[in-house]
């Protein structure tokens, strides 16, 4: 499988380095880390998010598996609960395939942000703040791990500060 990327102009690119190039029968030289279009061999600047460059916002269903298992395995009854559905908006764009079929697409980053509960002004069941016990917030992790939400926030900010100062190194 090979993932498609888009640039700021909306042009689609098949980047070299996509995992599908790893198992080609005949080596094409496209299993590498160069950010180039595998078809045209031209470099491009990929768009990280469709937010602000989208055709529409769409609801995506995510599953919250928090209560589907027991964290105390010695007392587990072996019975589980169903996952809870969480609906969150993501920015999307419509593209046409070569056979004229229309597809609705988004970026992996936009899906990741929605899964993690980072609203970016989008609609849906996003956490209101760090104290909201929805999945992946400091309040949620405190209930799951016993680690204080304030400590989790502090550590997260220190990681971010270090990344900024070292430019990600």
Positions of the model-derived regions?
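Long, well-ordered, tryptophan-enriched scaffold segments
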Residues: 1-165
